[in-house]
């Protein structure tokens, strides 16, 4: 390969690297990267920076759980589910009704919301996705997009467009956690960590770990992984592909069922709240690698940190700008994702 063809094939990557180098050089020349300037900035904004790091990690864990369902569905069924965010919204409304009508704690409601979304996902897969399995890719995308619009408008009819939220009777002041009594919100090195965000992060890590063990250690998980790698080969060794597709789609939607219950204590719900999660989840899946469970968690943490740190260095209205920059860099330099496999 000649030098000219090599440069031509990697022109976009070279331009991106050149742009980063120019920005760094400009900041150095203008004194913005001088040790004294950095020290002054840290003295003024150190607490804000630490708070952004803490919040980014906590939110990133939940993002990872949402993206996990999306990457699982794509890895096995080879379909991008644009209705993922709308299903998250449905899970939030289910949790809201359980809490306001039946006094079911949101963290207990996970045991109801996740199975309910599993059943809803299985029905969608059987009645909507399965008949279109041989359709062109763009038709499948339009199908899931139409499904998302249907779910959003159905929720709008039932609950109207008024944002709804809940306020837990605990989580502020001394809170008995069984093994110990903890005073919330936690204050560590100048950062504030609320109970609801910490609980969401820990539950997300736990559920991600459980799903990872399910995929790695059980016969069902081995069947799912075999189907993702080679459908025809899996069929030849006796695996029921249609059953695996149905279960996998159900597991993917169960992930957003759990995530919906986890975010409701600190996020108001309206019929379109899932759209932002949808966009973020797609970025995470591309960043972490299509079909990679650890990649979804890693991508979620990176995106969560990028969002929160972006607010420190730029106006809050540009919160997603840094996320899309990461998205473009991932597409240019590692299109298979951080932990994905090259096709």
Can you name each region flagged by the protein language model?
Residues 131-132, 137-217, 244, 309, ...:
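Transmembrane helix-bundle core of multi-pass membrane transporters
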Residues 59, 189-269, 293-298:
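Helix-loop-helix "hairpin" substructures at the membrane interface of multi-pass membrane proteins
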Residues 103-147, 154, 298-303, 334-335:
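Alpha-helical transmembrane segments within multi-pass membrane transporters and channels
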Residues 54, 76-123, 127, 132, ...:
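Membrane-embedded helix boundary and interhelical linker motif in transport proteins
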Residues 61, 70-92, 106, 134-140, ...:
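Short, non-helical or kinked segments that cap or interrupt transmembrane helices
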Residues 32-59, 193, 214-219, 245-287, ...:
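Inter-helical junctions in multi-pass inner-membrane proteins, predominant
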Residues 1-33, 37, 48, 229-236, ...:
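Cytosolic-side transmembrane-helix boundaries in multi-pass membrane proteins
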Residues 2-65, 94, 106-107, 136-140, ...:
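Membrane-interfacial amphipathic/re-entrant helices at transmembrane-helix boundaries
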